Amino acid sequence: MNLKKLWFTIEKLLQTTKGNKMKISEEGKALIKRFEGCKLEAYLCPANKWTIAYGRIKDVKEGDTCTQEQAEKWLDEELEEYEGYVENAVKLPLSQCQFDALVAWTYNLGPTNLSSSTMLKCLNKAEFDRVPSEIKRWNKAGGEVLDGLIRRREAEALLFQGKDWHEV
């Protein structure tokens, strides 16, 4: 491990809560809400899946509706699940902003993509400097590059680095 990677790892160890269950922050949740949007009626997303609320696909069918209160509840429940996926997959400590970005990414792309990604391999080898570019590679739905996914991945990459993502 080179000195730069060692220092970065030490710095992140000092900023982390690894060992305690990490929770997504309001900042991470805001990123998800912004890019998912909230729709109270089921719709077909670009990946051709029935979706409702803040990107919920579980048990959704055409014609389904929900209230804003239900959408918020579902998001909180699902985020707890996705926090667990990230916690279990990443073997090194993370800062809050890194954790938030990874939960947002995994919420959008799913735990299977996380577990098979080069991004995860980079994370677990402490190659944190490679992660932002790996985040950005995932900009397609249905085989097509989408402007919305380009912006979302840019925002997640910035958040991962602890930078302001709001202007993306």
Name these PLM-found stretches.
Residues 2-47, 54-61, 66-84, 92-93, ...:
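Long, amphipathic alpha-helical surface segments
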Residues 32, 98-106, 134-136:
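Short alpha-helical scaffolding segments that buttress acidic/His motifs in well-ordered protein cores
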